[in-house]
Amino acid sequence: MAITDWPEEQRPRERLIRHGAAILSDAELLAVFLRVGVTGKSAVDLGRDMVAHFGSLNGLFSATLNDFSKINGLGPAKYAQLQAVLELARRSLCEELQAGVALNSPQAVKQYLQLLLSGRAYESFVILFLDVKNRLIVCDEMFRGTLTHTSVYPREIVKAALGHNAASVILAHNHPSGTPEPSAADQTLTQALKQALMLIDVRVLDHFVVAGKQVYSFAEQGQL
């Protein structure tokens, strides 16, 4: 049955307008995005198929066009729409950080890094360079590695911090394995970067490890 044949109070779009997006399930939110289903399936059914196929929203958001198009009813047009929505969300959070709330809103930093890093099939090391008022200057993906390892060079980070005239930085990388706890190597690297940046009067405010929906904060755990 098409969603247009459902009782109005059960239709995802109408429920969103009346009660807000937070009450909708993942499949219902995707149905609003999709607008229509395919033969024999409503948009909600198709939304459920998408979540089941990719295992999670993070898996869906990081899917390639080829993988995305394997689901009947999905193709380049919907893929482009989804990527545009994700990029708008990233830019919205980036604007919030640039407004000078990096320290006052650690949750915004976490959300931004989750959007940026979760779902990647390789390790990526990014740095948020901040000015003296804790406003974001730039977020730079400085190093990219494999499924289990990324080579990070402190000298390059020091050079970048000087180049951006940064007063402080926030470090972040992802764990494609899905486990957010930092390794011994992560802890050693964090301290090495802290010491190297201290020599040029740049503070390390935090180091986040992103693993899907989980984010580990070195600062929150008292490891800085």
UniProtKB/Swiss-Prot annotation:
InterPro entries: MPN, RadC_JAB, RuvA_2-like, UPF0758, UPF0758_CS, UPF0758_N. GO terms for biological process: proteolysis. Zn(2+) binds at residues 173, 175, 186. PROSITE patterns: MPN (PS50249), UPF0758 (PS01302). Belongs to the UPF0758 family. Keywords: Hydrolase, Metal-binding, Metalloprotease, Protease, Zinc. A motif (JAMM motif) lies at residues 173-186. GO terms for molecular function: metal ion binding; metallopeptidase activity. CDD domains: MPN_DUF2466 (cd08071). NCBIfam families: PRK00024.1, radc. Residues 102-224 form the MPN domain. This is UPF0758 protein HEAR2468.
